[in-house]
Swiss-Prot record:
It is a multi-pass membrane protein. Gene3D superfamilies: Regulator of K+ conductance, C-terminal domain. The lineage of its organism: Bacteria, Pseudomonadati, Pseudomonadota, Gammaproteobacteria, Vibrionales. InterPro entries: AAE_transporter, RCK_C, RCK_C_sf, Transp_YbjL_put, YidE_YbjL. This is Putative transport protein VP1232. The chain crosses the membrane at residues 8-28, 37-57, 66-86, 91-111, 164-184, 386-406, 409-429, 443-463, 478-498, 506-526, 539-559. It comes from Vibrio parahaemolyticus serotype O3:K6 (strain RIMD 2210633).
């Protein structure tokens, strides 16, 4: 049986798409030392080569890809978007705007000075900033008519310029950002480890950010004379058992009767108490608790320890510090804090925002009591609320179609902005109403990534025909300009953050990387800081940066 692969791919466009995806994703896993190409650039390079070899596909059919991608970006940003001005939020907003304004200004000025073709500058900026939303915003402005294509060009040629510019600049942007993360602290003689420790000391973090996470365990002890002497007649509230031992007294058996103690309870000789705490806390208990006094009573030990993810929802909690929760009052143990899918240091001074996820363990009723106070327990269902997902998608498209008129000028926001706004709204509502609009994070990631990959395949196959012509004509020039656009805004943002905003350097480097939406560079900064504290800064800028980058692509292509 003979199979003509070329003919097979020509006649089966769906097969072509997934062949390009499979090859591109495999290429994206290639590493050069610590540098990985990544899925986006792998798929784009593959689709450009396939397009150059003569394979084609109707790019219009793949616009659903960028629509899904930008919609999911909005959903992820929604819970934290409106909390951007909490505590350091203004600093993060200023840094994101600094990178954006500097990049757009530089790209606009350099592209006009060197006479870059229409569309090439937007693609170059998207690659130099490793920010795919720039590319999405630019193409949507073309599709919606916000940007006017020059008379001597057509849509397909502009699309070629966008994709080739992105492909040529992306690696420059990625490498330069990683080098920035490695070299600038040394050039400035900054010790990121010291900066991280400084924040830890100022905010009461200590070493908790690096501790391993365990489930608490239950052990029971009989109260003897030594323990009575230790309590000195004080009640449980006065004793502060948790402060001294790291364990909570969950139950007391007295005269055969089981009870849940309150703060006024006073221990008596012969009581049997059930303590809940981490294994190391039990090991550190005073000998008056442990020596020969452990008991094994099934009824006393019959407690259900659970670990739940609690989503912050309460207006009374959002904007307050983690320490204000007083977890010791609830008998709960905090294991992790996650914001925008980024694990945060266990900083007692971190300001909580709606949508933050606290991984908490403890006795079931206590954990549920805490959840009622601060928000809700995250749904562990594998079912998505597709009705809400689709409805808000429709609203986003409809909003993007609305035409506004100012005098003689009429314009619409376009699909990208409309879907961003509807996605942010859905994400925000999801953070406040646990049963509404739920989409499992894994499903959301898959839709977002697959949408982005479809988008890359579409523009790559459409643009690949003249790829090598572009490389020979403007390749060196675009690469040089991409380096400038990648590095200069970052340096400006560093100067603003360090000398005007006077930010801690560990937070500043994390924030700049978030403003550049360059996740690979975060590993470098965390390694240099010997801490996850820079993630505080990264999470602060990442959500707003994704939104601003989309708008930047729209603005730049209109100005061009």
């Amino acid at each position: 049986m003979n199979i003509d692969v070329v003919q097979l791919l020509d006649q089966n466009p769906i097969l072509l798409i997934f062949v390009v995806l499979a090859i591109g994703l495999a290429i994206g896993k290639i590493r050069f030392g610590n540098l990985q190409l990544g899925n986006s650039i792998g798929v784009l390079i593959t689709s450009l080569i396939m397009g150059h070899l003569g394979f084609s596909f109707n790019a219009e059919a793949l616009t659903i890809g960028f629509m899904l991608f930008i919609y999911c970006v909005g959903i992820e940003a929604g819970p934290n978007f409106f909390g951007i001005f909490f505590r350091d939020g203004k600093h993060y907003f200023i840094l994101s705007m600094t990178v954006l304004v500097a990049a757009v200004s530089l790209t606009y000025g350099l592209s006009h000075y060197f006479g870059l073709d229409f569309g090439l500058s937007a693609g170059m900026m998207a690659g130099a900033l490793t920010a795919t939303p720039v590319l999405v915003g630019a193409q949507d402005a073309l599709n919606s008519g916000l940007a006017t294509i020059p008379r001597n060009m057509d849509f397909s040629l502009v699309l070629e310029n966008l994709s080739v510019g992105y492909a040529m600049a992306y690696l420059i942007g990625l490498i330069s950002m990683i080098m920035f993360a490695k070299l600038l602290p040394k050039l400035q003689k900054q010790n990121l480890s010291d900066s991280a420790q400084q924040i830890a000391q100022e905010r009461g973090l200590g070493n908790s950010s690096q501790r391993k996470v365990y489930l608490p365990i239950i052990r029971a002890y009989r109260v003897g004379p030594e323990l009575i002497d230790w309590t000195d007649g004080k009640n449980l509230r006065e004793l502060g058992i948790y402060r001294q031992t790291g364990c909570y007294i969950e139950r007391i058996r007295r005269n055969g009767i089981l009870a849940h103690p309150d703060g006024d309870a006073i221990l008596q000789e012969g009581d049997e108490i059930a303590l809940v705490g981490f294994p190391d806390s039990h090991a550190r208990l005073d000998p008056s608790f442990r020596n020969g006094k452990e008991v094994f009573d099934r009824n006393l030990l019959d407690l259900r320890i659970v670990e739940e993810e609690i989503v912050v929802k309460s207006d009374a909690i959002a904007g307050k510090r983690l320490s204000d929760l007083n977890l010791s009052e609830f008998g709960c143990f905090l294991n992790r804090v996650v914001r925008a899918q980024i694990e945060m240091p266990m900083d007692l001074d971190i300001v909580l925002a709606k949508g933050d996820v606290l991984q908490v363990s403890g006795e079931k009723s206590r954990v549920h009591g805490l959840a009622e106070k601060i928000g809700f327990i995250s749904i562990h269902s594998q079912m998505a609320d597709l009705l809400a997902f689709c409805s808000f998608f429709i609203l986003g498209i409809m909003f993007g179609l609305v035409t506004m008129t100012f005098g003689q000028v009429s314009f619409s926001l376009g699909n990208a902005v409309g879907l961003l706004l509807s996605g942010i709204t859905l994400g925000f509502l999801r953070a406040n109403h646990p049963t509404f609009g739920y989409v499992p994070q894994g499903a959301l990631n898959m839709v977002k990534d697959l949408g982005l990959m479809f988008f890359m395949v579409g523009i790559g196959l459409s643009a690949g025909g003249k790829m090598f012509e572009h490389l020979t004509q403007v390749g060196p020039q675009v690469i040089g300009l991409a380096f400038i656009v990648s590095v200069v805004p970052v340096v400006i943002a560093y100067l603003v953050g360090a000398y005007i905003l006077k930010m801690n350097r560990a937070l500043l480097f994390g924030a700049i990387i978030g403003a550049r939406t360059c996740a690979p560079a975060m590993d470098v900064v965390n390694e240099y800081a010997k801490s996850t504290i820079p993630a505080l800064g990264y999470a602060g800028t990442y959500a707003i940066a994704n939104i601003l980058m989309t708008l930047a692509g729209t603005i730049l292509i209109i100005l061009s």
